Structures are given as structure tokens and as C-alpha cells.
Design a protein with these regions (language model features):
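An extracytoplasmic/periplasmic, membrane-proximal ligand-sensing/linker region
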Residues: 26-28, 260-322
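Positively charged n-region of N-terminal signal peptides that target proteins for export
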Residues: 1-4
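Short beta-strand->loop
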Residues: 108-119, 154, 176-180, 198-199, ...
């Protein structure tokens, strides 16, 4: 009798989950963006929120919860009720690299979230001050090795994608320059313009207007393919440094335990939205490379997070060792 009761209860719960998913969403959904408004992560999150709103018939509202390299907002999302009414638009920094920088993080990127879907990847650019004595990656490496003690590297905060990108570059070259933290990409660019720091690695969109204006030099795109926004800038692979590979993923997650039918409903809406030409243009204007359809789903995103954690952990631990 006891076993029959348990089986019946499990069937009832499964039925409730299915009914919940069938009706979902019935009210406003919060999309946490764990960074301040205005940057690539925020714009990407708003594009995603708009997709969900249009395809699922309820308002998906962005809430910016910045601080500590995106980990404060990510922690809030991890602790939210797993009912589909709080999701997060995160990226490689918050959902792969963060444990290396924050030992008391409070969440596990692999264990505390349900992957929903991969949005895009944003290749990073090595940008240097206008008068930096190098015009390509080979010259940069030679100068950096000979003048390691003089180099100042700017980044947008510990755990940010620019911080990760710079550490990957430094590791590939074998240098440990002075690292100067800022509160975002814009202050880093201002410091490069003013000559206070020598270089930065950041998604293309941040340095782009300064490169186009000729006030900052672009030396390398950190992927296999050139950026359509800067087609004349060669890649790290072309210039013989494939270890400098950094194209942070941007993706959507839900708290662990969110019913799978809800996850699948969100994933389906995201996939449909990413197929729209207008959405593809908006993301391309950010310098993003939209994920191919076979890489977008929950299973593929989960595998990507796992592989990025495995790839980044030894590199970043070594790069940040005293």
C-alpha cells in the first residue's frame, strides 16, 4: 500500500509539472542580467527578454543586478524559486570562470543551474594604446617579454570577460604584467586613451569606436575567424598564437530544479527568436557570433559549460597564482 501511494504521488507531481509547463508563463518573468545597464551583457539580455516576451505571451523584464564580476546577480538567480519565473542571462565569466576568482562564490555553475540555451559568442580583441610600440601580435609578444615589468594591463574587474581574456593572453605569452582593475569597459578604454594602461582584451564592441577613430590600435581577434566588424584585423590563429582563444559565450539559465517542460519551452522560444533576421542583425551589431542551431539547446549548453570549466580552470589558476 505504501509503495502504491508513493507511486501515485509521484505520478501526480509529474502531472502537476506538465500542467504547470503547459500554462507557463501566467505572469511576468524576471530576467536577471548580472551586470550594469548598457554593456554587451545587458543588451544581449534585453534581446533575449524581448524574444521570450513575443513568443510566450508574457512580459519578461530585465533586472540588472551588478557587482562582484556578475556573481551577485548569479547567486540571486541560483537561489530563486525553480518555477521558471526567474531566469538569468549570463556568460562565460559568471558560468564558467567565476569559481577560479571567488572561492566563496555561493553557487556552482554546473550544479546550481539548468541550462536553457546558448545565445551567441563574442570574440575578444587585443587593443593597445595608439603609441604602443607594436603593430601586430608578434611585435606585441616580443615587446611584452622584453618589458614585462613596465606593462600595465587594464581590465573591467576580476571575473569579467576582459579579465579572463587578458589572463588567457598573458598565459599564452608567459608574462605577468601589472593588472589595473576598472569598473567596466568604458573606463578601461579611457585609461588606454589617456596612456595610463597599455592594453586590454575585451569583446569587439567595446574598443570598436576607438579603433575606427584611430585612437586605439587593434592587434588580434582571439578566435579562428575574423570579425565582420573589423575584417582587416588578423586572428590570433593567423598570427601563430592559437592559445589566445577567447570568445565568451552568452547564454540563458534557470535555477536548478526548474521543471524540464518549462526549460524546453524556453529553449524552443529562444531558438525561434535566434532564427529571426532582425535578431541576428542586432546580435551581429554587437560583434556576436550567433550559435549554430545544433549548439543552442539545453544539452549542448550544459556540455559547453562543462568543457569551458575544464579548459579554463588550470590556465586561470596558474595565471592568478602569486
Amino acid at each position: 500500500m505504501g509503495r502504491q501511494w508513493i507511486a501515485a504521488a509521484l505520478l501526480a507531481l509529474a502531472g502537476m509539472g506538465g500542467a504547470q509547463a503547459q500554462d507557463y508563463p501566467v505572469r511576468t518573468v524576471t530576467v536577471i542580467v548580472p551586470f550594469a545597464a548598457g554593456g554587451p551583457a545587458d543588451v544581449t539580455g534585453r534581446i533575449v527578454a524581448d524574444i521570450f516576451s513575443r513568443y510566450l505571451g508574457q512580459q519578461f523584464v530585465v533586472e540588472n543586478v551588478g557587482g562582484a564580476g556578475g556573481t551577485l546577480g548569479s547567486l540571486r538567480a541560483a537561489r530563486a524559486a525553480p518555477d521558471g519565473y526567474t531566469i538569468i542571462s549570463g556568460h562565460m565569466g559568471t558560468h564558467a570562470a567565476a569559481p577560479m576568482f571567488y572561492p566563496n562564490l555561493g553557487y556552482d555553475p554546473e550544479k546550481d543551474f539548468e541550462p536553457i540555451g546558448l545565445i551567441a559568442e563574442q570574440p575578444e580583441l587585443l587593443a593597445v594604446r595608439k603609441d604602443f610600440p607594436a603593430n601586430n601580435l608578434k611585435e606585441f609578444i616580443a615587446y611584452a617579454k622584453a618589458n614585462e615589468g613596465k606593462l600595465n594591463m587594464g581590465h573591467a574587474g576580476v571575473g569579467s570577460v576582459s579579465y579572463v581574456g587578458c589572463l588567457l593572453l598573458n598565459s599564452a605569452i608567459g608574462i605577468k604584467p601589472t593588472m589595473v582593475p576598472f569598473t567596466g569597459t568604458a573606463p578601461v578604454m579611457n585609461a588606454i586613451l589617456g596612456g595610463q594602461v597599455d592594453y586590454d582584451c575585451d569583446p569587439v564592441l567595446g574598443p570598436l569606436p576607438h579603433v575606427q577613430a584611430g585612437t586605439v590600435k587593434a592587434l588580434a581577434i582571439a578566435t579562428k575567424k575574423r570579425s565582420p566588424l573589423l575584417p582587416d584585423v588578423p586572428t590570433s590563429y593567423e598570427q601563430g598564437l592559437p592559445e589566445f582563444d577567447c570568445a565568451p559565450f552568452y547564454a540563458v539559465f534557470a535555477p536548478k530544479g526548474t521543471p524540464m517542460p518549462i526549460i524546453e519551452k524556453l529553449a524552443d522560444a529562444l531558438n525561434k527568436g535566434l532564427n529571426e533576421a532582425v535578431v541576428q542583425k542586432r546580435l551581429a551589431d554587437l560583434g556576436a557570433e550567433i550559435a549554430e542551431p545544433d549548439r543552442r539547446g539545453p544539452k549542448a549548453l550544459g556540455a559547453l559549460v562543462k568543457s569551458e570549466v575544464a579548459r579554463l580552470t588550470p590556465i586561470l589558476k596558474a595565471a592568478t597564482a602569486k
